[in-house]
């Protein structure tokens, strides 16, 4: 079925699927209102010009295989859709349906018809998660199937007043397919993305810190793509590198502050709790929310250069790590209206 501008269907895979090793794919599918969907197929060639064949001309190269393919997705930070990419990069996490008893990290009771998703650092060193994508260009009758799409980075930052999300990674297998004849369905337009204004000053941060002006974060997923004797010209396996996912924050402050500078110079560790709280409600008076908590340390400081002006701010990268007491480096909690991201485990 054609759709203006095309569409992309996303579904969770049990394990990253290659050409010849398909695992189960979720029947629960998602169509994201992307602003851009990227894909690319790097081709491997064998150039036999170096052989002694009695002539000096170049030989046409032979196609011998494919490197891991590039994929990406750009979209606004929608509260329901962020969870799918978290599932794909971090696994299922811990799901609890709102019941009038459980609370969110702010201590607010979550009613029925709300859902709490929690992803905690140090719990992902099991199987690698991935997505299957159908990419449809209806006007050109081009239909692309991608398997084994592993998110290697999720980056969230403000674009003006709107929070944007950029997801990038590689995948194992890309091919053309017949028209999948899908019928895209999207969240209602009434479900809006998180805004910069949905974030206030953090509930917990370094004492006496400067006033925060903007906040973005990056979640990196270190994986490696490899080949076995699978009978395929494509790579067919994805491994964790032995390092867990890493969360970093890019913080902009309105002014320079001696406490922030002292914390950087001393390598001071501190606890963080910050959140986006939407002005839209999931049900009743309970809004969409996104929380980041963890153990942080300033890793650098880029202050504004001294100029003939009253106020000077700065940019501070923040790194998260496991505390000496064993507390996980970070916890990400999403409160939204989705009760399932996958029909496969």
Label for each model-derived stretch:
Residues 1-345:
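Signature of extracytoplasmic/envelope-associated structural regions
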